[in-house]
Amino acid sequence: MLEVHYFAAARAAAGTAQEQIPDAQVPARLGELLDQLAAAHPGTTEAGMGLEEILPRCTFLVDGSAAGGSYPGVALEGVNRVDVLPPFAGG
């Protein structure tokens, strides 16, 4: 089971703070997971942004480690948690 945790605008667009993806539905790579999540959550934030628009701006933590700039290719085998962190504003 893979847990996906959403924060800030990603949480608003997804309509949930977290979800669990059954092992059989977890794709091989993070980029594929993000496509899957965007398709599963077509809603928008109050500002009218959808998850599909927010995800490219996000930072991703995979089991607590930053995925880095090559995040679409990060393997998800054996991963338990992905955090979706959009840019934060304010102090």
Protein language model annotation of sequence segments:
Residues M1-G90:
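Ubiquitin-like/PB1-type beta-grasp interaction modules and other compact soluble beta-rich domains
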